[in-house]
Amino acid sequence: MTYIHKPQLIALCSDFGNKDFRLSALKATILKENPTVNLVDISHEIPSFDLVQAAFIQSNAFRSFPEGSIHICWVFNVGEDRGILLALWEGQFFILPDNGLLSLICDQYKPEKIFRVSDDCFRFRERISSVIKHIVSEEDLSELFDPCEDPIVKINVSPVYQKDRIQSRVCFV
């Protein structure tokens, strides 16, 4: 299996906000193990646990990045811990919690590959940094991680068209 490697950019999207240490701790952990990567912030102002808004922002942003970029989209509710996924889709890598976010980003499309990086999100900063190192080092990901056949799937909200109205949800303003 051939993978697209040599990512130039790591794009970050989260619900961390900018008021505490979490974002800087994530960036420092990534750079400590991967000093040659370039970090780009997409957004860290997603409302807490809002998977729909995170998916909307991520799915609209990632196509602007060069092939082989790594996208970390971390919007996570501790009570729903099913682990960490690594997906390859449209020539880009996605690292995110297994909480349905991947299915919302990809909508009706299926990623080429999905790997389960970890069964839990404990120490996620270190795990994410390690996954990035494997990708940057051009290692065979299928030898390092098990395929994930059953990621959590969530369905995007679609508008309902009626004779005199359209009913939908606003996910981003």
What function would you assign to each model-found segment?
Residues T2-Y3, P7-E45:
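N-terminal glycine-rich anion-binding loop in soluble enzyme alpha/beta folds
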Residues D120-V173:
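Anionic-ligand-binding alpha/beta catalytic cores of soluble enzymes and soluble regulatory domains
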